[in-house]
């Protein structure tokens, strides 16, 4: 298999873990999910350089899926010549509802002082919005995320693919991903069971 550099993304609670599994079970590909150390949303030169080195120094390329890659994609495209970006998109209301259930008393999307909302390590991995409620902020995050990835797709139309989360459950959807990544037919992974929403991350 040719050298393959892949960044996967999506808002989180959108099928990113399932995407990593679909890619990573293809023959000859190792695809991780949210490999550490995670990049914060705001640019950190040291952490960025470490992730970049993982891509540049691996003889077979590298593949990782993490929602927090979005603000760094333009920089990655400048630094990685053969980069492919895959983004999964789940319905806005489903992402908001899932995050509301998943995060409890944490609020990653609004600035806070730790009284109403608990401080959480993941706070640094998300952008902040001037919302009046947590669910409103998550909705604003969804809007920002998919607006931005579509702008990046317009800049790199051959190297960015956005797929609906549901496509991970279909042969047609998985073939679209494999075709985009130029994975040979014999190396492709076809799961017996479908991916279910409760497994989305």
Language-model features: locations:
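Short, surface-exposed basic-aromatic patches at helix termini and helix-loop junctions that form
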Residues: 23-25, 76-82, 86, 178-182
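Short, conserved active-site loop motifs that form the nucleotide-linked donor/cofactor pocket
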Residues: 29, 60-61, 83, 158-161
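PAPS-dependent sulfotransferase catalytic domain
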Residues: 44-57, 67, 71, 107-176
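The conserved 3'-phosphoadenosine-5'-phosphosulfate
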Residues: 36, 41-43, 92, 151-201
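Short His-Asn-centered micro-motif
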Residues: 9-10, 63-69, 88-90, 164-166
